[in-house]
Amino acid sequence: MRWLLLGTLGLAACTASGDGDVAASDAAGDDVFADASSSDTSVFADTGDADGTTSSDTGLPIVDGCAAVSAADDVDPWSMRPKSAGFGGITEATVGTHKDVFLDSPTKYVRVGARLDWGGTVVFFGLTANPKSNTIDANDTGRELQLALYDPTRIRQGCAVTASCATSLGSCANSITYLGWNPVQGGDECNRGAPVLSHGKVGDALELVIQPLQWNPDWDAPDCRTTACSGAGRPVDVTYRMRLRFVREHVVEVDTEVVSKETISHPTTAQEWPTLYVSNGAGGNPDLPVLLDSAGTAPSIGTPGNDGFYYGNFTSPAPWVTWQNSTKDYGVGLAMDQGIKAFQGWRGDGSKAPYFHNVRASIAFGIGAGATIRGLSYLALGGFGTVGGELDAAAKARGPFGHVDVAAGPIVFTKGSPLKLAGWALDNRSGTKIEVQVDGAIAATAAIDKDRGDVCAVYPGYVGCPKAGFEVSVPTTGWSGCPHVVRVIAKDSDGNVQVLGERVAQAG
């Protein structure tokens, strides 16, 4: 079962949309997280060496006093990530009445598992050799690690049909029974699982592609009817993609993507991106009742919500939190790549509501018609100290990502006139700078300070949004008439360096 504070969701409209450079398709092949390395253009740069010889710098042939140079092809910005910790293998197994698929860590010490008959939701994260070490609540189609989306104008049955909930919520009760538009990864309130369209190995990741179901099959009814659970669930015209990948022995990267095929847009509101339900002692698994922020402080979860649940909003000093057992030596952490430090915890006390614990980051965004939306989060296994150390290390290894939009291809320059470059970059913390190199030498720098709402609509919640863009002017005074390689680099405060794009510039 799922718990959501209803009637308090933001109503600001989301009007920006991404473009092909903001959310490009993944390159084919296994190494989907590799840096750009292939060549798209070969021309010649001045070396001072004689024609008919080879360049003393590059070893390439000299033609008209210019050595061959090339620029690497652009890559999908979403592939700009650290390499995985390795691949421990994928296995499938029947667990009770369910079909699950598991990805092992490189040493096979830790395992993460997804349920194929519940929309590929994460239902296991624990020790490979101990099935009773599971830190994830796998109670039903609404309680796992999963995605769920909302629309403030269609938040409740009765008013959802006319998209009028922002002005009047109507007469249906403030309960998850009467949720409106709400594609849920796991399935619906009848415990019918969402279908997994495909699953398998992509690079070192386990990929699952899902068509979510409306949580409430009666979501668009004009009244408060409740139809009996019979027949199939109601699929939504969006797809969820989840990729699970070990980036450290104890840390799984959770890569999520939503692609809408709808013709309607959904305004900005709070989303579950994702929500982590943790084990509650059922089935011999550990009970993890202690929620801690990154400083080890337990936030209050005592505000009454709907359906007898309690919640609490809080801020963590770092962008991660953890649910632990009573001795704080075993549990699971959730970190947000976007740098989000605001969280919301939920619980049921076993009296007014079933006994459960969950947490999610406080993130709000809209879903445009035909939009693509991407996000990253991380799960870490262990005691409080292990979780913190592992998540901090993963965050420091995560570098910037972005794209060079201008120029989109090879550049024709006029000697003495500056080159104009523009693009965007995001990172998991502030302080990232842009550097432009020409033939390997620094030629210009820039701040990331331009509004790029289109970028932040695809990658919502990242530090600095909506100011994700940069513009830079590169002087060409003193350049030779030969072609030059222009490389745009993002450097962050952790020392990570990422090439955003390369272009060949040739005199016109």
Mark where each language-model region is.
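Beta-strand-rich recognition/accessory modules
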Residues: 69, 73-108, 115-117, 317-399
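Bacterial N-terminal signal peptides that target proteins for export
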Residues: 1-4
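Extended, loop-rich substrate-binding clefts of extracytoplasmic carbohydrate-active enzymes
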Residues: 155-249, 263
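Short, solvent-exposed, Trp/other aromatic-anchored flexible loops in extracytoplasmic proteins
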Residues: 307-343, 357-369, 447-482
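Beta-strand-rich N-terminal accessory domains
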Residues: 63-183, 376, 381-382
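Long, low-complexity serine/threonine/glycine- and acidic-rich segments characteristic of extracellular
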Residues: 399-508
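Ser/Thr-rich, Pro/Gly/Ala-heavy low-complexity intrinsically disordered linkers and tails
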Residues: 7, 11-67
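Acidic (Asp/Glu-rich), glycine- and aromatic
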Residues: 247-297
